[in-house]
Amino acid sequence: MSDAGTFGEYGGRYVPEPLQEPLADLADAFDEAIEDDEFREDLDFLLEHFGGRPTPVFHAGTLSERYGAEIYLKHEDLLHGGAHKLNNTLGQALLAKRMGKDRLIAETGAGQHGTATAMVGALLDMPTQVYMGTTDIGRQEMNVFRMRLMGAEVTEVTRGSAGLAEAVDAALEDFAADFEDTHYLVGSAVGPDPFPRMVREFQSVIGREAREQIQELYGELPDACVACVGGGSNAIGLFHAFADDDVAFYGAEPGGEGPDSNRHSAPLSGSGSAESEPQQFQGMRTEVIDEGTENHSVSAGLDYPAVGPEHAAMAELGRAEYHAITDDEALEAFRELAESEGIIPALEPSHAIALAKRLADEHDTLLVNLCGRGDKDMATAAELFDLT
């Protein structure tokens, strides 16, 4: 164990001894790379010319009238690949190349991180293997096709609940067996150090852009920033640029069938969260759902039983609030944004839209991270809304 990369009592590097040195080397390489102007220039070039940055901020006028507050959307759904994930995969893949690694592995739930990893693997000519649970393969077939089309090997994970957490376990095992040549491209702000701060760094472009853009549109900073939180990469990427401002932070956790039920994925706001103690989980110390709670969300990208350690620390400090959004609330927001603005969100940011609706009585101006588009969720939506 190491106290590297801690956020108060959270974070750290809780891994077997054989992984301590590889992760320390990765941390050193990351710290050097982000101070290297050439690395920064290469990343910025690809984010602009391959990824399509900057993504715009859009005032959702009709939705604002409907909810009773000014709603601004940070359009990460317009990034190449359809979600915010490319910000991180480009950064980590360039770092892996710099370190002399020749293979990428990743976990994925909704398939967006797997797709973004397959994209950079193809771009940089690096063999790519993506671990994905059986449950998620079944509900995210389009993204499985996309990954395979771009040359990635998609490996089905059948253990346990066959979801995102099990995919992370499988990827960690692969990395432990082949860390000399392989880079584990972690998709969220979770895991042992340096992954949480590395992912935050590469996703912080979201907040840097949004902070400037909303001031141009609105004339001042928003009252609050809102984002969905599973592991929490899109949220920490938005929040980080506003950390020293008088701006409230709200995270929408997946409340599943209800925060007081035994089927949700909301460790900071679900049943038992007030009495919970931090646990060691997948290489980090963080908050995890109760043992008797079944990890569940209508959103494949949010059904993760823990939360990124920086979010756990922000909740403890009172810097951010986390609220459970049920499946039904997220689905209602999914439909409301589509009907109001002609924008079909992914089910993940639909949780953030639903939380913005709940917060509209408390704040005049809300900046919401629309971290992905809903193409991947259309089969689910068509069935649930009887659109066929």
Regions found by a protein language model. Give the residues of each.
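Buried hydrophobic positions in well-ordered alpha/beta secondary-structure cores of metabolic enzymes
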Residues: 12, 56, 73, 85, ...
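A short, small-residue-rich loop immediately preceding and capping a beta-strand
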Residues: 80, 88, 98-133, 221-234, ...
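Active-site/ligand-binding loops adjacent to catalytic centers
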Residues: 168-194, 198, 246-247, 251-343, ...
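Glycine-rich ThDP/TPP pyrophosphate-binding loop and its adjacent helix/strand module
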Residues: 166-174, 181, 190-246
